[in-house]
Amino acid sequence: MLLASLDPSALTATDIADAVRIEGAVLSRSDLVGAATSVAERVGGAGRVAILAAPTAATVLAVTGCLIAGVPFVPVPADVGAAERRHMLTDSGVQAWLGPVPDESEGLPHIPVRLHARSWHRYAEPSPDATAMIIYTSGTTGLPKGVVLSRRAIAADLDALAQAWQWTADDVLVHGLPLFHVHGLVLGLLGSLRIGNRFIHTGKPTPQGYAQAATEHGGTLFFGVPTVWSRVGADETAARALRPARLLVSGSAPLPVPVFDRLAGLTGHQPIERYGASESLITLSTRADGERRPGWVGLPLSGVRTRVVDDEGALVPHDGETVGKLHVRGPMMFDGYLNQPDATAEAFDADGWYRTGDVAVIDAEGMHRIVGRESVDLIKSGGYRIGAGEIETVLLGHPGVAEAAVVGMPDADLGQRIVAFVVGSAPGDELIDYVAQELSVHKRPREVRIVDALPRNAMGKVLKKRLLTDG
């Protein structure tokens, strides 16, 4: 059963305790089963539905109701632009909105979610191979693509993470992340409903919200993106409030080493770092009982295999330095891109390995470090293959740098020249010399551009292609 903690036959008198806290609403496990089953009765039989995925109790019940009824859903960001929303609705072929609707509903009918309605009808568990949801990618390379995720893939990933993080029903999981991405929706919400722990959504991922969840509700497992953890680390009072926690988990973008170190110093916890994508879910992570090395995303999860290859497809040595293209495979892979068979075929090689599009290194112990995106983070300059992330890490260690992003700009002589975009007060010449001293001369930026802010998406990832085109 995908949502194992919501098995009606397993509910007991103790299930009157709160299972989910979100937007001021408190839902017990019994509330979740009764209200979500009522949603399932209204949505049952639909082909696909859209859910406006704001952090609300209605979203929780809509998602849960769809999974009970076996109806695939499309989580739609509440702040998405009209053109992108129209594409998602048209491409997915959804038949209705479930729950609240945006101002522009595109003429689709509306199925309400009633928080106080209850039904105790028993639904048969859908096939593990059935589609659970279609998550649209960020669209950095064109219109967003619909990633088709099966119930089997989600269950396999959550079980592997539970093993890696020693995640149990005794945990209290806290985050304030969006409910339209893998991080907040699949790991945070569905993970809690599968494992049976309490789930607290803070509305927004603020240091104060996380601290309050720790002190008032006994939060043990906190999820955040690097931007969140940077802000927590800048608020000493909030950071120290997380000392009783069990794990701080960072993902969706690389965690800067200075942020890792500051969190460890203030909270007493070295953050867990993990790696994944909408297409593969989470495939790599450091362990609750294992080594946590700043800048490294750990070992393959149970059932996952990885390899790093060069441009000719040959395996690169596991020496912790040689950069190559990261391929993964495992039971949590997506079923393909909706309506895009050519893109799906291109995503996998002839042997069934998923081409992540990221470049990485593996060391002798099997630990993985993500260098970045093959398209923007692997810089080929003067005959060298240079990872942008390595340079960014060094720049962030300079006291005059708050944020940094490194790209390779076209260059007639070098092929690509290294350009650093920096938020901070340090002079560019000083930063160039600093990198040359810390790494090597050929890895130094040829140019440093001081900017007020770096362009980022909703999950905090720097939009490097925008830097390349607009920079």
What positions do the PLM features span?
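N-lobe entry segment of adenylate-forming
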Residues: 1-47, 69, 212, 428, ...
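Conserved pre-ATP/AMP-binding loop-to-beta segment of ANL
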Residues: 4, 11-16, 118-136, 143, ...
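AMP-binding/adenylate-forming catalytic core of the ANL superfamily
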Residues: 330, 335-336, 359-443, 453, ...
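Conserved AMP-binding A3 loop
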Residues: 25-30, 132-159
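Conserved AMP-binding/adenylate-forming
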Residues: 25, 40-80, 385
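Gly/Ser/Thr-rich phosphate-binding loop
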Residues: 219-224, 234-293, 305
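Conserved beta-loop-beta connector loops within the AMP-binding
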Residues: 307-327, 346, 364-365, 426-428, ...
